[in-house]
Amino acid sequence: MSDTSTKTTLPNEEKFKDLMDLPYSELESIDDADFWAHYWAVWNANNPCVPGGPFVPNPEQEWVLQLMDEGKSIFINSPAGTGKSALVKHWCSKTTTKNIGLTSTTGISALNLGGSTVHSFLGIGLGVDTVDELYDRILKNHDKRELWLRLDVLVIDEVSMLQPELFDKLERLARKLRSSSERFGGIQIIATGDLFQLPCVGNDSSLIVDSKKFKKCIQVTIKLRNIVRQEDAQFKAVLNKVRVGLVDEHVEQVLKSRFGKTKSLPSNIRPTKLFCTRKSVQDINEKHLNKLAEMGYEFREYNMEFINQECPISFEYIVQNFTRNSTTPETLHLCLQTQVVLTYNQSPYLVNGSRGVVVDFTEEEYPVVEFLNGTTQVIKPHKFALHYTSRRGKTQQVGYAVQIPLKIAYALTIHSCQGLTIDYAIIDLNDCFEFGQAYTALSRVKTLDGLFLKKFDFGVIQPHPRALEYEQQ
């Protein structure tokens, strides 16, 4: 990947003005970083964004809206902050003649989008069952069966975090449920994401574009270029370089200027703390709980209960595997004023990832949580199904884990905040272990002034090799 700071010859001013008047579809194929930097600088200066105002699409977004209106299945593979989610929400709001499924791969990004997780919306549970098992499951659920049959468009935000094997499974399931030989059963696919951000958790080195079905379903792949989350040209340039793993002297200089700046934060600002690992997040959360204890708040303890349903192998092994991978803690301590996050969907508006504060407890000792969207809800214990997969690939339910679906949330992992925009963030990148993790974290923040970094080794900034390969194709 070439250094985007390298100077190339720009069109003369007269020719550039002529190009600005052309339809974006005629310019889209131009692969010149300096041209696009100049193009968007001029366009943004003449069309300033109004904070809180209505969504006004720019030329490249207008082009994408036209493709969606035409019924094209598209993949918007674009940098963080280019308005992918806002664009999709705008199209869905103005498209009233189609049944649209608005989904994302994570709870937090689904909440940000105003939709549901793809697993919840399509009724596939964890998605671990075979196509035939999922088919039987959906046939037994009248509402989900009707949903699949009526669906015209399926939006999948943050699709780069979806396992390619699961997409293949969904494509086959769609054709089977709808008795159709068309790709994805004739459903239009609108997928958005960024291959340079975090890939799906627990997967090998493959990406969504390694799915054979995905390649066949997608008719147009789009790269949006105009970053709207950050306005500072210098910060944009740094993020564009970090995205592809280009760490030059300028990148180091700018990021080092944000080391150890937390003391300059106003006292009324509570920045979001982002960490690479669950362990670091747990340590911060425990620190805040200890402060609440010192203030005299009374804690309630909730322990996960496990129910065995004739498991064919060691049930202890099943339990250990579940607790190791579950986002719901085995032991949960809560008191008034504890900041929490949901770990299981409660409603279309309260989903896995919704953040809130404990404001009361019921007579049964269930926590009452006031969420950021203003909703207050009693959170009761949930039964999490425990599964076992045989060597032949047969998956069966072997028991339950019962727990209050909450966890402490004073700090977040970088994985859990992909797709979000954050005003102020304290980021610790010292334990980066995944391709794209550093870029994902840095690109959450709107301004350099809102970015506060712990010192880190710049060697942790690494793009996914397959993402680079795909970008260069």
From Swiss-Prot:
The species this protein was found in: Invertebrate iridescent virus 3 (IIV-3)
Single Gene Ontology BP annotation: DNA repair
GO MF annotations in UniProt: ATP hydrolysis activity; DNA helicase activity
Name of the protein: Uncharacterized protein 106R
Family per similarity comment: Belongs to the IIV-6 030L family.
Alphabetical list of Pfam families matching this protein: PIF1
Gene3D superfamilies: P-loop containing nucleotide triphosphate hydrolases (3.40.50.300)
